[in-house]
Amino acid sequence: MKTLNETTQQSTRAGRYGKDFGGQYIPETLMTELEKVTKAFNDLKDNPEFKAELNDLLVNYANRPSLLYYAKNMTEDLGGAKIYLKREDLNHTGAHKINNVIGQALLAKHLGKKRLIAETGAGQHGVATATIAALMGMDCEIFMGKEDTDRQKLNVYRMELLGAKVHPVTSGSMVLKDAVNATLQEWASPSDDTFYVLGSAVGPAPFPEMVKHFQSVISTESKQQLQAKEAQLPDMVVACVGGGSNAIGSFAAYIDDPSVQLVGVEAAGKGADTDRTAATIERGSVGIFHGMKSLFMQNEDGQIDPVYSISAGLDYPGVGPEHAALAQEGRAQYVGITDDEAVEAFTYIAKQEGIVAAIESCHAIAYVEKIAPQMAKDQIIICTLSGRGDKDVASIAKYKGVDVDE
């Protein structure tokens, strides 16, 4: 079975970012299905009835708009910029993932699909997909690396509780990239009833654009909310980056405002200068994988290197093509945060604000801890909390040597 990193057909026009990132590098077996998805997205994204249906689910099911919360204690403790937290952790299912899943599931419904498949790393995208499949009466199958099923057992059970079948992926490094491979292989199998709900801003066009479109609600809201609270734009927007869906959603409404600094925070793991890292933009090089041209952790022969992070949601060996372009153009800055720094931030935000945030989000919080004291008191940071940290409590306790009964 061919996967999307085996280039058999490509488009030099579709979904390009910057000089040459993005595109469609896919096997022939997927081109027809991808064309159907592209047409449906382009036809429906601005359709008033589709937009009304999407908005109704976002408001009445997903609990939007999410709060823009002034982190008073953190602001006072760090002694610099005012810190606002965009609370995606308060969405139904506990993360930003639901925004994109609702949109793609509605596309699937309009295409007459009966079955949703998806990859997941930390499990949040899988939970969101299983949730919407249950709501819409669709079958659901989730592919998750065996390493991740072992460290996110609670989310595995949650998906099964919602009616999904979870497939532990035992190939490769048994992490997110391998889950993506397995899902792509399943999607390439002959079937007219299946829709692939891709969870991050990666893959062949139109997925990066589509995910950005559905996740841009994060920054559309935060821009309006901060205007109401402070009557100004933020000076900086900070979000964690794996594949990059929460970050591109957090950045989208500000990309054309050059006064707003955009900072994506990658997982440096044991250190960006070690081989136990997932700092793709800092360490990666241009390549083709999972249907797109972007930056990847790879060797001289173009083979994908293993990556590592304490965070199951950030240990992807690539990054979305728009992030690669934003980095190349200097419009956004990308920094690395280590496991130790993220774990410290997990404790810090809990004690300062009474919020147990996802370990993915705590990479962004750790950077805010560093940068806020260097900024003026009249400056403002918006930091996106991509999800809640219930799923991480046991693993963080284990990391710190605390014995807890899961």
From Swiss-Prot:
Under the heading CDD domains, the entry gives: Trp-synth_B
Q: In which pathway does it act?
A: Amino-acid biosynthesis; L-tryptophan biosynthesis; L-tryptophan from chorismate: step 5/5
Organism the protein comes from? Lacticaseibacillus casei
Transmembrane spans: none
Pfam families named among the record's database cross-references:
PALP
Enzyme Commission identifier(s)? 4.2.1.20
Protein family: Belongs to the TrpB family.
Q: Which residues carry this modification: N6-(pyridoxal phosphate)lysine?
A: K97
Record flagged with keyword Lyase: yes
- What's its catalytic activity? (1S,2R)-1-C-(indol-3-yl)glycerol 3-phosphate + L-serine = D-glyceraldehyde 3-phosphate + L-tryptophan + H2O
**Residue ranges of coiled coil:** none
Tell me the PROSITE patterns matching this sequence.
TRP_SYNTHASE_BETA
Subunit composition and interactions: Tetramer of two alpha and two beta chains.
Q: State the top-level EC class.
A: lyase
Cofactor(s) recorded for this entry are:
pyridoxal 5'-phosphate
Write down any Gene Ontology CC term. cytoplasm
Instruction: Tell me what this protein is called.
Output: Tryptophan synthase beta chain
Which InterPro entries is this protein grouped with? Answer: Trp_synth_b_CS (IPR006653), Trp_synth_beta (IPR006654), Trp_synth_beta/beta-like (IPR023026), TrpB-like_PALP (IPR001926), TrpB-like_PALP_sf (IPR036052)
Family matches, as NCBIfam families: trpB
What the protein does comes down to: The beta subunit is responsible for the synthesis of L-tryptophan from indole and L-serine.
Keywords on record: Amino-acid biosynthesis, Aromatic amino acid biosynthesis, Lyase, Pyridoxal phosphate, Tryptophan biosynthesis
Molecular function as annotated in GO:
tryptophan synthase activity
